[in-house]
A protein has these predicted regions:
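Start-of-helix signal in alpha-solenoid helical-repeat scaffolds, especially tetratricopeptide repeats
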Residues: 14, 48-50, 107-114, 158, ...
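Structural register within alpha-helical repeat arrays
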Residues: 20, 49, 56, 113, ...
Length: 230
């Protein structure tokens, strides 16, 4: 219901983009009965623009539509180029960048590049190019590791460490996947998707006792959330 509701304001548009990404990433698919909402991001910042293009890329990936995915990559690259012109050598947005809340920053430019690498990895997957997929994912995690953690709504909707971890699991490389999920959890403690990925990696490594401990964390955290919501 929340995804289908939004007023014409920058805050609600930003929230809608975040929620749509969260729905698709956490579930692993987009519900057929739910219509994806198009959002006019012209007055929003690079974070929201990155997230919107990433969401569209996920939908294109699900449909195995490489052409549509490439268009999203091209679109975000254009936004990155425009934003780069508004940040000076010190990494500070110039006056012409608009409202401070949505003005681009040097950090934001780097995080956008992370998202582009993630999208390129998905495109490589569709084309069956495993070496290029891994190259893009490795580059994404390297760059994300150089960035600060977002205390509020995440700039990077699908942490590249988790995306890489999920891909490594699919390649039957659980030990390497575990490293990526642990990296994601190092600054996103109790993130459900990362914990589930960690469980899958541990079980693939026959480390069942450790997997049970992680599963207990999910149960405890979920219970705490239910109590808080009452």
């Amino acid at each position: 219901e929340m995804i289908g509701y939004h007023k014409d304001s920058t805050a609600s548009k930003s929230y809608l983009i975040t929620m749509q990404n969260e729905q698709r990433i956490e579930a692993g698919y987009w519900p057929e009965e739910l219509m994806p909402q198009k959002v006019d991001y012209s007055k929003l910042g690079l974070s929201e623009k990155s997230a919107m293009h990433f969401f569209n890329s996920l939908l294109a990936f699900d449909k195995k539509d490489a052409t549509a995915l490439q268009l999203e990559i091209d679109g975000l690259n254009r936004q990155l180029s425009k934003a780069s012109l508004l940040v000076n050598d010190e990494g500070i947005a110039m006056c012409s960048a608009g409202p401070t809340r949505y003005a681009p920053t040097k950090e934001g430019l780097k995080k956008t590049q992370v998202v582009i690498h993630q999208m390129e990895a998905m495109l490589a997957q569709l084309k069956g190019d495993a070496p290029l997929t891994e190259e893009r994912l490795a580059k994404a995690t390297q760059l994300e590791g150089e960035c600060s953690y977002d205390a509020g709504p995440p700039f990077i909707a699908y942490p590249s460490f988790e995306q890489y971890g999920d891909w490594l699991l699919a390649q039957n490389r659980p030990e390497e996947a575990l490293v990526q999920f642990n990296q994601s959890l190092s600054n996103r403690k109790n993130r459900n998707k990362a914990l589930r990925g960690k469980i899958a990696a541990l079980e693939a490594l026959s480390r069942t006792d450790e997997a049970k401990e992680v599963r207990a964390v999910i149960v405890q955290f979920t219970s705490a959330q239910k109590v808080a919501a009452r």
